């Protein structure tokens, strides 16, 4: 056990074998504790409300309530809870819907167990964690998208560009603040300003915008 409280994880997946495997592995991590398991989105929302997890590992295709709907419900009730989606496929509509609903990470079910743990830790730290194939898909989608925001009516300041560049590297507000020698609260304000100017809805979209505009290297 670490000196700090472990990351409280809720697993939501309709396959019992997946839930069991994830629980066994995550409970072996010194900084994690699986506090609950749910078999569908509706149960997941109820358990998130009751257990108040730090991070939810969420399947997307489930009976009663799908993962995207559950993500939206959980984030509306508990915005501080981070959500990482886990699926066995990459479908653009599902990926974008999950991220727009509030997910901060996306990993595939065939990923190495260590990658799943890394995604949980990244989400807990306020960072973005995307499977490389998912990041490439979304970056390509942004390249194909034609939007008035491609030519910024309200250009970013140099400091905002610095923050956006660090967002593109997946940094949390705390890490951005430490890197730029500003407070975490100031970093959060910069992020909010950037999202507003670019017409983006989330840190994930901002990170992909940074990749598209070559502020950081494109993933794999």
Locate the predicted segments by residue.
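Acidic catalytic/metal-coordinating carboxylates
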Residues: 40-43, 64-69
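Short amphipathic alpha-helix used as the core "switch/output" element in two-component signaling
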Residues: 46, 68-80
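Active-site beta3 strand of CheY-like receiver
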Residues: 51-57
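Recognition helix of helix-turn-helix DNA-binding domains
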Residues: 170-205
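Active-site residues of response regulator receiver
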Residues: 13, 59, 87
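The feature encodes the CheY-like receiver
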Residues: 18, 63
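Short, flexible helix-to-coil linker/hinge segments that flank and couple to helix-turn-helix
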Residues: 93-100, 104-105, 110-158, 162, ...
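Short, conserved "switch-loop" micro-motifs in signal-transduction and mechanochemical regulators
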Residues: 77, 89-90, 185
């Amino acid at each position: 056990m670490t000196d700090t409280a472990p990351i409280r994880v809720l697993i939501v997946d309709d396959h019992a074998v997946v839930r069991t495997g994830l629980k066994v592995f995550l409970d072996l991590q010194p900084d994690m504790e699986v506090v609950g398991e749910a078999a569908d989105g509706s149960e997941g929302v109820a358990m998130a409300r009751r257990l108040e997890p730090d991070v939810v590992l969420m399947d997307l295709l489930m009976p009663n309530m799908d993962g995207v709907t559950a993500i939206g419900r959980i984030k509306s009730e508990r915005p501080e809870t981070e959500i990482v989606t886990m699926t066995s496929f990459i479908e653009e509509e599902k990926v974008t819907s999950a991220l727009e609903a509030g997910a901060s990470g996306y990993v595939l079910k065939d990923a190495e167990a260590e990658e799943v743990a890394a995604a949980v830790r990244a989400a807990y730290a306020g960072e973005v964690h995307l499977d490389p194939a998912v990041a490439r898909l979304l970056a390509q989608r942004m390249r194909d998208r034609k939007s008035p925001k491609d030519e910024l009516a309200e250009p970013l300041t140099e400091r905002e560009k610095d923050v956006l560049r660090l967002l593109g590297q997946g940094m949390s507000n705390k890490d951005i603040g430490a890197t730029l020698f500003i407070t975490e609260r100031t970093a959060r304000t910069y992020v909010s300003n950037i999202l507003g100017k670019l017409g983006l809805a989330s840190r994930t979209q901002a990170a992909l915008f940074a990749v598209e505009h070559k502020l950081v290297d494109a993933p794999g």
